[in-house]
Structure formats: C-alpha cells, structure tokens
Amino acid sequence: MERINHTSSVSEFILLGLSSRPEDQKTLFVLFLIVYLVTITGNLLIILAIRFNPHLQTPMYFFLSFLSLTDICFTTSVVPKMLMNFLSEKKTISYAGCLTQMYFLYALGNSDSCLLAVMAFDRYVAVCDPFHYVTTMSHHHCVLLVAFSCSFPHLHSLLHTLLLNRLTFCDSNVIHHFLCDLSPVLKLSCSSIFVNEIVQMTEAPIVLVTRFLCIAFSYIRILTTVLKIPSTSGKRKAFSTCGFYLTVVTLFYGSIFCVYLQPPSTYAVKDHVATIVYTVLSSMLNPFIYSLRNKDLKQGLRKLMSKRS
C-alpha cells in the first residue's frame, strides 16, 4: 500500500505503546505472545470442532465458527505489531502501515459486532419462534447474513480511512497508543478534523448503537419468552444457551462504548485498557466462554482432541 497523502511531511508514526520503561518490554512481549497464541489456538479449536462434528452443523455454530475466524484475524491485525515494537528500540509504523492497521481494526471489529447481532437474532428465532426456525435460519439465509456481516463493515472502515488520508500531518508523529486508532491519530493532524469528528460522532455511534439495540431487543424478547416456560428444566436450558452470548456481548460492547462513544478530543491513556479488552482479551476469552457451559461444544472439542491424539 503506497502512501497516498502527499501533503503530509510525516512518513511514519511512533507508537508509545503500553509502557516507556525498557525493563517492562520483555515482560509485556511474553505476556502478549502467550495471549496471542492462546487466542489463535482456542479459536482454531472451535472452528475445527464445529467443522468436523456433524452434530454441530447448525446455524448457531455456523455463526460461531465465523466469529472465531474473525477473532483470529482481528487479533492478528493488532498483536504482531505490538510484539515487534516491544523488542524494538524504534517503535515506529509507516504512514501506509498505520492506515492499513486502522482499516482492518475497524473492518474486523465491526464484523465481530455484526456477527454478535446475527447470533442474537438466531437465538431469538430459536426461542421465540421455534416452529419457523428451520425456514428463517435456512443455510441460504445464514450464508447471506455472514456475507453481509463480513462485507458491509469494510465500507464503514473505508470511509474513515479515506477521510483520514485527506488530512495533513506536519511535525508531530507520536501516537499516544499501542496501535493506530482513529482518535489519537486525529489529534496529530495540523489540518481541520471537523468532518472526521462529525462522522465519528454521528455515523460510528449510529452503527454501534443500532447493532447493540438489535441485540438488546432480541434478548429482552428471549427473556420474556423464557419466563413463560412452565418447566424449570426448559428455563435452565434456554438461559444456559443464551448466558454465554450475553457475557461476550457485555465484554465486547462495554469496552467499545468506553472508547468510541466520546469526542476524539477527550481520548485519554485510560482508554488503553478498554482497547486491550475488545481487541485482545475478548478474542482470547470467547472460546472459553462459549465452551464453558455448552455441552455440545465440549463434546465436539473432546472428539477433536481424541482424533488428534
């Protein structure tokens, strides 16, 4: 990707990272390397368990396999560069590299968000309209939902990337972050960021809040339906099926709202923690959360491990 913004005198950015202390760098490298390997391994096991187990060939697990794939790509867009910078004295990223990382950060993060909304809709249909579940969640419809979830977010990401590329960056090139995120990069621009801020404060929240409301509506309807079930075992099964989805949604959206539902000018170092949660920790924890109380997935993982041993 060649640098397009010829009006900038900045050809690279410096990422300050999580700590400026040299003695912390190797510790952080080992910590995030372990997290990255656990993320890749855990999500890959979920994908393989679903792929090779006939009992898991359902819409719910179809969506889960794509969520795991997206989580692998999402984490890979962030962590490898972090690991390189932990061991490097010059913690730099090229202008083109910064735009590329930001593009995939937004595209894959929004794909995650879309897939969580689709999975909530799937559970809503399964619990609230079970007689039409096979028709509504047919394989054709599932493929279309996944295709939309993985393609539409790229338009959102492309919009922010192109608007950012129009800006001029003069002398300051130090990003107070461990990755190229929109708000800290906008702070470095020596040209007007009015349009960027308007888009970020209107389009981005609308996209995020709309998906979150879809998820909230789905689970409110599920809750009201489950409470009407006379059988205690039926209630327990429905709650256990949806409980881990709510855990993932809370973890993912809670951290995202902390970062992005605020003006770019108010972005602070404290937001690093929330960014780590939704870019790194969420992707690592998802496989454990999904398999913790899911007997079918546990059985699928056991079968997969027994085949490999």
Swiss-Prot record:
GO terms for cellular component: plasma membrane. Residues 51-58, 122-140, 221-237, 293-309 are cytoplasmic. Glycans are attached at residue 5. It is found in: Cell membrane. The keyword Transmembrane applies. The gene is OR1L8. Keywords: Cell membrane, Disulfide bond, G-protein coupled receptor, Glycoprotein, Membrane, Olfaction, Receptor, Sensory transduction, Transducer, Transmembrane, Transmembrane helix. Odorant receptor. GO terms for biological process: signal transduction. GO terms for molecular function: G protein-coupled receptor activity; olfactory receptor activity. Pfam families: 7tm_4 (PF13853). The chain crosses the membrane at residues 27-50, 59-80, 102-121, 141-159, 198-220, 238-260, 273-292. Disulfide bonds join 98-190. This is Olfactory receptor 1L8. Residues 1-26, 81-101, 160-197, 261-272 are extracellular. The lineage of its organism: Eukaryota, Metazoa, Chordata, Craniata, Vertebrata. It is a multi-pass membrane protein. The keyword Cell membrane applies. It comes from Homo sapiens (Human).
